[in-house]
């Protein structure tokens, strides 16, 4: 699997020497060799690759990767450009439209957010094809908890967006008064109507960033053709 590099490698280096990580690594490698696993192994740490620790301004916590073909590429809620936008992301786009007036794009590729400092971290980084939560409990949670603790310790303001109960269970790890914690129900169609719609998390995030002298996030994901023209 593609190793971590740069700032996150330095920040998380102690984890790689822990007994749980040796077991996790062995399990994950065996799974990739014997089963269909998402995301592709080289994309597993993309959340960390795209958003170095020193650049993190916002953290969005997901659960585990999308588990259907061609979707997952290492950023929570995001899918590759040519894949149908998943239901939770449809609802995220709807809230963005209602909150900030963003148009609803034709794809679910969220790399633009990650490149601006939005760490899009699943708490479990791999999954078996078509089996949600199949890698829960194999050790990823310990690893991503270590990342969350490191983020909490940063001596600068960070916004944590905690959507749904699993993400909100991490709130107890976040006790740095510099940070802003925003909570809402999960954007899934099963729960979005309970308060994700109307939460205004995107505008609240930007207000907080600006108040703290930071550039706001440009949340507008462009249509596929426009993204490709910029590359």
Ranges and model annotations:
Residues 2-3, 14-162, 166-169, 174, ...:
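A polyanion-binding, active-site-adjacent surface
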Residues 5-9:
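Short, contiguous pre-domain boundary segments
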Residues 196:
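C-terminal substrate-binding/active-site "lid" region of AdoMet-derived donor-dependent transferases
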Residues 227-231:
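Acidic, low-complexity intrinsically disordered tails
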């Amino acid at each position: 699997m593609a190793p971590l590099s740069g700032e996150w490698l330095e920040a998380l280096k102690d984890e790689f020497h822990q007994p749980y990580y040796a077991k996790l690594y062995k399990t994950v490698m065996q799974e990739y060799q014997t089963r269909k696993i998402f995301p592709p192994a080289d994309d597993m740490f993309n959340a960390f690759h795209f958003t170095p620790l020193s650049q993190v301004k916002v953290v969005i916590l997901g659960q585990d990767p999308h588990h259907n073909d061609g979707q997952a590429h290492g950023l929570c809620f995001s899918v590759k450009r040519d894949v149908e936008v998943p239901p939770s992301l449809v609802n995220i786009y709807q809230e963005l439209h209602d909150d900030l007036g963003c148009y609803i794009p034709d794809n679910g590729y969220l790399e633009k957010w990650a490149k601006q400092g939005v760490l899009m971290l699943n708490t479990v980084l791999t999954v078996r094809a078509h089996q949600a939560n199949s890698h829960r409990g194999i050790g990823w949670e310990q690893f991503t908890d270590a990342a969350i603790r490191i983020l909490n310790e940063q001596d600068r303001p960070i916004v944590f967006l905690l959507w749904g109960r699993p993400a909100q269970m991490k709130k107890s790890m976040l006790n740095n008064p510099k940070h802003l914690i925003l909570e809402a129900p999960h954007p899934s169609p099963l729960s979005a109507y309970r308060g994700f719609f109307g939460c205004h998390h995107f505008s609240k995030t930007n207000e907080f960033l600006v108040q703290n002298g930071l550039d706001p996030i440009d949340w507008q994901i462009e249509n596929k053709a426009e993204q490709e023209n910029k590359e």
